[in-house]
Amino acid sequence: MSVLPVIYTDLDGTLLDHDTYSAEAARSVLERVGAGGIPIVPATSKTYSEVVEFRSSMNLTHGFIVENGAALYVPVDADIRCPMGSKLFDGFWVREFGVKRQALCDVLEALALGSSYRVKSLTEMRSSEVADITGLDLASARRAQQRLYSETRDWRDRGAALPAARDARTRIEVRAVMGGV
């Protein structure tokens, strides 16, 4: 059995410019690595829709990891075995490691009952509001809203509310990751 190199990379602030979301500065490196036959596997907080768009724009053809490790997508025509426990979706073998978004939303909604947390979900917002908050164009904002495994929220509270919400999530084993800073 031979060992082949693989490059795993984040997107935000790595291949994508933190302020403009452009990958143009990385294009020539991606092309050279791709020409050498080395797979580039993005591992990101981005959604399936966002990564599919990125892969297309950068001519990437290998697998990818979405929503902070919630799922692995491997093209069905890849020269590797189908990941155990995977299902077929849109030309990819998908191995899910996280819960579906709706199950998470149900837990988060129950958690918020009786509280006065000021928070708004990305999927509850208009796409134009997401674009304003994130700096994304409208089409990119829509792709960012197409979450399958995680729920991005705009936290609008201050003071003791954040530690209280964190403690409540910890009790039910829901992990939150702060992004966008």
Where would I find each of the regions flagged by the language model?
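Asp-based phosphoryl-transfer active-site loop
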Residues: V3-T20
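Well-ordered beta-strand positions enriched in small/hydrophobic/aromatic, beta-favoring residues
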Residues: I7, L72, E151-R153
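A sequence-level detector of short linear motifs
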Residues: D17, C82, E173-R175
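Short, glycine/acidic-enriched capping/hinge loops at junctions between secondary-structure elements
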Residues: D19-T20, V76, P163-A164
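Active-site phosphate-binding/coordination module
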Residues: E24-S121
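Conserved acidic, metal-coordinating active-site core of Asp-based
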Residues: L111-V181
